[in-house]
Amino acid sequence: MTAEKAEGATGFAGFDPKSVEPYIVKDPESLAINMARAAEQLGKAASAWLAPREAGEKTDSFAEPVSDMVKTLSKVSEYWLSDPRRTLEAQTHLLGSFFDMWSRTLQRMAGDAVEDPANLQRNDKRFADEDWVKNPFFDFIRQAYFVTSDWAERMVRDAEGLDDHTRHKAAFYVRQIASALSPTNFITTNPQLYRETVASSGANLVKGMQMLAEDIAAGRGELRLRQTDTSKFAIGENIAITPGKVIAQNDVCQVLQYEASTETVLKRPLLICPPWINKFYVLDLNPEKSFIKWAVDQGQTVFVISWVNPDERHASKDWEAYAREGIGFALDIIEQATGEREVNSIGYCVGGTLLAATLALHAAEGDERIRSATLFTTQVDFTHAGDLKVFVDDDQIRHLEANMSATGYLEGSKMASAFNMLRASELIWPYFVNNYLKGQDPLPFDLLYWNSDSTRMPAANHSFYLRNCYLENRLSKGEMVLAGRRVSLGDVKIPIYNLATKEDHIAPAKSVFLGSSSFGGKVTFVLSGSGHIAGVVNPPARSKYQYWTGGAPKGDIETWMGKAKETAGSWWPHWQGWVERLDKRRVPARKAGGPLNSIEEAPGSYVRVRA
């Protein structure tokens, strides 16, 4: 087979021995000195990690997650090791794969162009350096990594007798181990790292270990992995700058109203209920990407709930408190500021789940102020809730509740780490390599600044969410109890615009689609391209991605997709049209706050509190 006949086929006939030149140490004395300096910085990192533990300020709970991982993976290994025939099958498959890999390597050494098998992911960004293919040593390591990872995933996939949750957890843990042990994460097995270390005589490691010490100190004994240059951003100065006012606040939230940019506005105001797991300004990163600014420019009177970054004082604030003191409070303020009782609403992620539960409570109480709801990547049925379910079972929740009881909240870093682990090969290890092994400062990126601006969660709120939604799926079953009432989404008759994103790993499209059938009224289901953030924050001017529209969300999403219409670009104009079809009446533009005195300029002070 020739290179022309097979795309991706490679051989080593053109391998030039001179290409090993960049891998030969030229100045061993400088390298030795820098290695000593790197070790000194590593010692400072260790001291920064130990100091809060020796002072009794921090205790570690490594045992629980490690124990759970070992217990889960042992169930997989038990299946394969309990029967000699299965053991032989597993060993034969792995050894056969390595034999094939060795044969391909020998053929390439002989100058033959050999195509990689399908399970070798040649488009993996981690292996972009050309020496991963051109250099026989690194090519062999690359192949061995993918072969072994594929085999481990197959062992989980083919193990019989596992319940769905155990299999899901096992697959997740295998992916975490594979991501951590990737040869791209080590100097001696990553050609680019090896060359850079030789070229700089180890200066990259000195800088990297210095950054490691700084990041552990910044995390008060925990690694606060820097994903972007946070010094380049300031909330209210070059991020979250759409003009507006904070017009009310309580212990749970501030209510913001944004200044009109059009002469007339839609009669119905718009209330946005963002997640409290992150901060609302993901919808207002900058003027070019701001959904809030775009909505204002379409004639929407936009109100936003800015949740408090809680501390021990908020330990008892549960879902009812967030429904009453968040959404209910905001509705009262909107009526005072505008005189309007009828409101359109948006809920994003867990903010959408809270909004849906509040709508069910309002239906039971006869509160009809919210006349439509738009849900961004929101789950109300958690049957197919994705990889976050890995962290949710009764044992893990009880352990988490015990930890939260000591402080009254869940540390923001814990939730941030969980989200980053969902995409460890993209959100953890590339930054580990760039920062601590290459010694390079990360580039400024507004979305990653927002991602690093984590929030705490009140103990009562977080426990209620995990148990009632992820563990017991009570909302979709009509079994959730709020304010002493059992609430049902079937009682929610108002129009729903339900947006899912195709590549969402937090609220999978399949899960969002299934939840559509829980509501008692008409649901317009829309599927956007990309993922949990980029699929939502997709302004029309960028002409990126696409969205699908179709019939009623019944049956399964695959059948729905087969009949859906694909439209290039952003879904935002489609949503605006949906809102205006519900009520297109307009009134003169409103002053922010109306008769209410503003407290401060948007984005307010609550959003500036860091975890």
Swiss-Prot record:
Polymerizes D(-)-3-hydroxybutyryl-CoA to create PHB which consists of thousands of hydroxybutyrate molecules linked end to end. PHB serves as an intracellular energy reserve material when cells grow under conditions of nutrient limitation. GO terms for molecular function: acyltransferase activity. Belongs to the PHA/PHB synthase family. Type I PhaC subfamily. It comes from the Bacteria. Pathway: Biopolymer metabolism; poly-(R)-3-hydroxybutanoate biosynthesis. The lineage of its organism: Bacteria, Pseudomonadati, Pseudomonadota, Alphaproteobacteria, Hyphomicrobiales. GO terms for biological process: poly-hydroxybutyrate biosynthetic process. InterPro entries: AB_hydrolase_fold, PHA/PHB_synthase, PHA_synth_I, PhaC_N. Its EC number is 2.3.1.-. The keyword Cytoplasm applies. The keyword Repeat does not apply. Pfam families: PhaC_N. Keywords: Acyltransferase, Cytoplasm, PHB biosynthesis, Transferase. Disulfide bonds: none annotated. GO terms for cellular component: cytoplasm. This is Poly(3-hydroxyalkanoate) polymerase subunit PhaC. The active site is at C349. It catalyses: (3R)-3-hydroxybutanoyl-CoA + [(3R)-hydroxybutanoate](n) = [(3R)-hydroxybutanoate](n+1) + CoA.
